Amino acid sequence: MKPAARRRARECAVQALYSWQLSRNDIADVEYQFLAEQDVKDVDVLYFRELLAGVATNTAYLDGLMKPYLSRLLEELGQVEKAVLRIALFELSKRSDVPYKVAINEAIELAKTFGAEDSHKFVNGVLDKAAPVIRPNKK
């Protein structure tokens, strides 16, 4: 699958996770509704589904990974920042096939696209501290 299709999968995952975090609907329903309503022509749909299910299933674990590196309470994070960080931490901790730098760079780009003005700096700061602990060999 092309890298662009993976990037689109991450973009769609941020949007769907944002919706899930706010609605707290079943993740399968959020996925179904998202795929029915959005143009997913250039999206790696399998990867999108894996990100959604992986983040939803591992939310407490992923939140635990980020908490030591947050400069504010988890509850005070914006929903976009939370979704972006959860995706990146899922990739870093559960997807060893995704290179360390790719997971971080993609998260920064997602934060620039969907987040508030400086959220990419915040996301970069958290991941810069968390990633070496999650992947000590930086691969």
Swiss-Prot record:
GO terms for molecular function: RNA binding. The keyword Transcription regulation applies. GO terms for cellular component: cytosol. GO terms for biological process: DNA-templated transcription termination; transcription antitermination. The keyword RNA-binding applies. Keywords: RNA-binding, Transcription, Transcription antitermination, Transcription regulation. Pfam families: NusB. Involved in transcription antitermination. Required for transcription of ribosomal RNA (rRNA) genes. Binds specifically to the boxA antiterminator sequence of the ribosomal RNA (rrn) operons. PANTHER family: ANTITERMINATION NUSB DOMAIN-CONTAINING PROTEIN, N UTILIZATION SUBSTANCE PROTEIN B-RELATED. Belongs to the NusB family. This is Transcription antitermination protein NusB. It comes from Escherichia fergusonii (strain ATCC 35469 / DSM 13698 / CCUG 18766 / IAM 14443 / JCM 21226 / LMG 7866 / NBRC 102419 / NCTC 12128 / CDC 0568-73). The gene is nusB.
